[in-house]
Amino acid sequence: FAAPFVSGGLAVIADYFEGQLGSKEIVDRLFATANKNGVYSDKAIYGQGLMDLGAATAPVGQVSAMLTGTLSGAMVPALFTGIQLTSPSFGDAVSNGVANQTIIFFDELDAPFRGAVENLTTDYRNQIVNLDGYEHMYQSTPQIIDSPDNVLEMSNYKNQNLSYGLISSMHLLEAQQDSNQFFTYFNKGNNSFVSHGINGSWALGIFQDKDLRYKSQLRSQFSNPWLNFSAGGTSFGSVYKFQHNLDVAFLISSGRNRFQANEVFGESNSSTVAMIELQPKNNMPSIQFGVLKENDSNLGLSGSGAFNGNGGQMTSFVGISDSISLFGGKFFSSLYVGNSPGTSNNEGMINSITDIQSSAFGMGFLKQSIFNSGDELLLSIDQPMRTESGEMNLRVPVYRTKERSVLFNSFGFTLRPSGREVHSKARYTSSFKNIGLSLTLGYKSDPYHIKSMEDYWYTALGFSIKI
């Protein structure tokens, strides 16, 4: 190296790393990253080789994230470090909370590389494809076999092979199709039921009412939201007569998270739910009590790498629901609230998560035989599961001194999203002989619980012909 060029290169490296490297580290880095290939390998002429500032300011080897407070402590690959959201309940809370926050990772020479914490978060809305108004592209074709002893329902979605010029890739629509394949079975003799690939509360809550049980369009709005975390698996349940005016239902469900709306890229997090439902027979609402155990997340909020540490999270919940005959139709409603106890972590960058309260609610009205014996009107309004309170506290490295000490930034933020999604929908269906028609009109405010997202209307018109 020529002395003036070396001096200039050292200054560039020192400035690039914000003065965090000592003089010896800078010189060692300059020599270690010099180009020693070809003619530059001749030490008699080029000494340490050709200075390469591009290589000197780029990571050397693997970039790692700290698990402890020192550079000599345990580290994990930065590539595997991040925060994932596989539930819509947090909305934009995490992305807002980490906005403008930075973090440093380290290469194999312990040089710091700065990045944005926000780039390490995977937002739920970036994992999904919005199919509102496109349900008719994959028409549900449930087959219900109803006998005196039992009821069997099997469903999948039939690809209509229509070209709508959607921005969304077709493979994501195919993934959405796969996620709607399920079966349910109800034994009328002993009041037991089993299902796979669907929220396990399909026969509980408002769905005790046989007029509502197989209204598949209501399931995503009125099923117990915590059972969505195991809806990709199998559920077993049974209803027992406890007293002459009280039945008690028991349910166990285990499987992966239904919120993996992007099945192509989503992780497979498994959860288990145990639930009891009290079913009074004196026109009183049903009450549900239950516990959700998630293996690798907290209500779908999970961390990996240096953000790991939320395994085995428990959530308790309670729900109340009812359906009554009113104005010649059925009025139905449900309300659910849950609590996830706080957690702390001695290693990693998530210091703690406080208690998280969450909620969901909905109400609707079903009226049949309005203009003819084969039509019905279904009105509903609901709020999907939403985080009502809770905080996350992070401790991330932001600076290292020339003496190799690491300085941390501790900060916390609310897990309550900026908005509250409310979904209103009206659906009219009618049939004449072998032809069926349906018209859906819906409105969403604060989609995904994000205030900055525009409210929108959607509509869908469909028809079917029985051959």
Regions found by a protein language model. Name each.
Residues R213-Q217, Q221-W226, A249-L251, V264-S268, ...:
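Outer membrane beta-barrel transmembrane domains
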Residues P447-I467:
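Proline-poor, low-complexity alpha-helical tail modules
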Residues G115-S235:
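Transmembrane beta-barrel domains of Gram-negative outer membranes and organellar outer membranes
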Residues G54-M154:
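Secreted peptidase-domain scaffold signal
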Residues F1-Q48:
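Hydrolase catalytic cores
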Residues F182-F186, F236-Y240, A274-N282, V318-I324, ...:
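Residues on the lipid-exposed face of transmembrane beta-strands in outer-membrane beta-barrel proteins
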Residues Q160-L162, N180, N190-V194, F242-V248, ...:
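Outer-envelope beta-barrel architecture signal
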Residues R219-S223, G233-S238, H244-Q279, V291:
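Glycine- and small hydrophobic-enriched segments that form the cores of compact globular domains
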